[in-house]
Amino acid sequence: MTDVTVKQLSEVVGTPVERLIEQLGEAGVSVSDADQTVTEEQKLKLLEHLRKSHGKSSAAGEGKKITLRRKSTTELRVTGSQGRAKTVSVEVRKRRTYVKRDEAEVAAPVEEAAPAPVLESKAAQIAKQVEEERKAAMDASRRADEERKAAEAARKAEQERKAAEEAARLEAEEAARREAEEAARAAEPETVAEAVEAAVAPPPSDAARPARRRRGPKEREDEKGGRREELHVASDKRGRRKGKGKGATRVAAAAVASKHGFERPTAPVVREVALPETLTVGELAQKLAIKAPELIKSLMGMGVMATINQAIDRDTATLVVEELGHVAVPMQVEDLDEELAVATAEPVGELKPRPPVVTIMGHVDHGKTSLLDYIRSSRVASGEAGGITQHIGAYHVQTNRGGITFLDTPGHAAFTAMRARGAKVTDIVILVVSADDGVMPQTIEAVQHAKAAGVPMVVAVNKIDKPEADPDRVKNELSVHQVIPEEWGGDTQFIHVSALKGTGVEDLLEAVNLQAEVMELKAPVEGPAAGVVIESRLDKGRGPVATVLVQRGTLNKGDVILTGQEFGRVRAMFDENGKPVKSAGPSMPVEVLGLSGTPNAGDDVLVLEDERKAREVALFRQGKFRESKLATQQAAKLENLFSQMQEGQVGTVNILLKADVQGSAEAIRDALEKLSTDEVKVKIIAAGVGGITESDINLAKASEAIVIGFNVRADAGARKAVAEQEVDLRYYSVIYEAIDDVRQALTGLLSPEMREEIIGLAQVKDVFKSSQFGAVAGCLVVEGTIKRGNPIRVLRNNVVIYEGELESLRRFKDDVNEVRAGTDCGIAVKNYNDVKPGDQIEVYQRVEVARTL
């Protein structure tokens, strides 16, 4: 067997070179360099020394064991649960134990004195065994050396081949490595499972140990079946990443088996999408987990033009969701209003009589407020602008027969909604009809409101003191509308009164009380209050003020109330005379302070125990109102898509409206919007209650709007802004004037109408030929005047056969500008020679006529 160097021997026995040189020195072998050769005799000498160092002699220790240990540590980089790389230390421990084969044969006791031939034979046996061991060790060393050299040569050839492949592959992977910087920083083995498996696998035989060495990730990948030659989607564009497994052999095998394929879903993902009443396109795309442009494309395919922030209704959303293959489910929103209705159901308590609520209705200027003025013994009408009522007045009057709550409604046509609200909350309607005017349009409307509300009527025939008064005429006209007097067999009381002199007022109150007794009006006094908003306004010093009519229960100062979209705690209450009150019972009108905003007239008022619940319901109602408003606006946009293209041809008057109370703002807004036509439109930019502020002026300037203040004024900042920005600001106290001014502004935007006016008619008597004009008609002017330069029509049997213009007008060979009736003339028609006797030539002119609404 060939000699080996110290370095090779250290690899065979698994001992560091420095330690082996030290052991050789202790055994008496002089070695100073790792490349120095060690002979077979020196190896045996070292073996003998090692045996002695373990407390064994050459003879006694031959039957004992020798153990060799080896420990190696490697580091692996693995990906953690959050995608971060971490280093794991892997320690491999190996142990080899060598036992002499014929242990029983050398177990003879040393103390016995053996004969000399036996000793010699034993010595020969030992020498023979040592020689066999030496030869076996030399053979094993030779084979290991040959295997190592062969493996080294194969490794070098493989490395050269793979280096060329690696260079080509790196070129192709450059783009992927730039996108996956995190993958490029982490260099891991192909799988953690392989590394762990290699670390804990049973070690090979001792003879194969020299050929074992730590291989790099590239070499392990080479031996596992070849390098990847292409990039794969399944590897997430990270061709340099190796770590995929969790440590188990089965998982690693499955990962290796499937890492070269595309991972595609086996079935389409079907989602259940909960849809509210309205939602934007962006919100729907988020629910569907798709990009908004794809959803917009689908909507366009269905004929719906929408942007990402545009709202669509539930029906449209359902159609597009089903078109995309998903399931649409209507969102079940918890209806807080229903819960509130159950929680605030009418309390069961002792019912006590309550005063009647009486609404005075009728045509404008028929004396409604004057009648109430006489009853209240105050001058209410003098305080109304123009002597007409502009909003509902609620008053509680004590009479000799008990209390009565009166509601005075406007009679003007613009206040239809106010009268409808008055009929809704009332018990009895007093219909005031002027004895001299009779039944008028608003009188008929008041009858319809009362019948729709199912409220009994008492007719007050007013102005009975006038000489031209005719009460029977009123009865006849009302009977046409099924209002039959009692004396005619009906059920309606007719009372003749004079609001100016007080005639018949007591009889009217008696009739009201009689009707109230028949109705047996009762309401619970105890418990939380409920009522309705009669009117609301924004007071500069006190904030939102609402006139509330209590219908049941008792409203106390400090109660938490909810009305429409507003809520708040009652900070103060005042009666109709402005005196503070602490509580109000059924049928009592009071002004309430402390709401979060001005509620709409007609909203229900409820008292709640919890302010948090009131806020929750108010916010819920605001959300519903916003959704419905958004849906309405969107529907209008979609319906008017083509009309908006021609919007430049439509004249528009922009109005910013501020009024003293909510009802007046609503009435004026409705009246102004009714003035719109197909050619001119009134656009209300904003409408509200309260004084005119600087922000209102800025808004009006930006939108080029006219600012209308109805019973309100601009503050100092607003007046300064008006002067600087030259905004048109107008104050009104009578609704007629506001409507008339806006109507005039709209009239100015109307394009003038072109009308044709016939100015002359001539009868053709004969036709002459002219070398200059061709056919010339000799005519007699029958009507009007024939003028040169005006357009004409040629009529035959009263049918127009030609339209053109006069080319020449002559009288006795002289050119003239006009010819009057009864005079002969010659008329040459331009570009027309088919004039015949008996035809008529009609001369007309186009006149611009200003249009009115």
Curated annotation (Swiss-Prot):
Residues 462-465 are annotated as: G4. GTP binds at residues 362-369, 408-412, 462-465. Residues 498-500 are annotated as: G5. Residues 238-247 have a biased composition (Basic residues). One of its GO terms (cellular component) is cytosol. Keywords: Cytoplasm, GTP-binding, Initiation factor, Nucleotide-binding, Protein biosynthesis. One of the essential components for the initiation of protein synthesis. Protects formylmethionyl-tRNA from spontaneous hydrolysis and promotes its binding to the 30S ribosomal subunits. Also involved in the hydrolysis of GTP during the formation of the 70S ribosomal complex. The keyword Nucleotide-binding applies. Residues 131-188, 218-237 have a biased composition (Basic and acidic residues). Residues 387-391 are annotated as: G2. Residues 75-84 have a biased composition (Polar residues). Gene3D superfamilies: P-loop containing nucleotide triphosphate hydrolases, Putative DNA-binding domain, N-terminal subdomain of bacterial translation initiation factor IF2, Translation factors, Translation initiation factor IF- 2, domain 3. This is Translation initiation factor IF-2. Belongs to the TRAFAC class translation factor GTPase superfamily. Classic translation factor GTPase family. IF-2 subfamily. Residues 362-369 are annotated as: G1. One of its GO terms (molecular function) is guanosine tetraphosphate binding. Residues 51-87, 131-249 are annotated as: Disordered. PANTHER family: TR-TYPE G DOMAIN-CONTAINING PROTEIN (PTHR43381:SF5), TRANSLATION INITIATION FACTOR IF-2-RELATED (PTHR43381). It comes from Thioalkalivibrio sulfidiphilus (strain HL-EbGR7). It comes from the Bacteria.
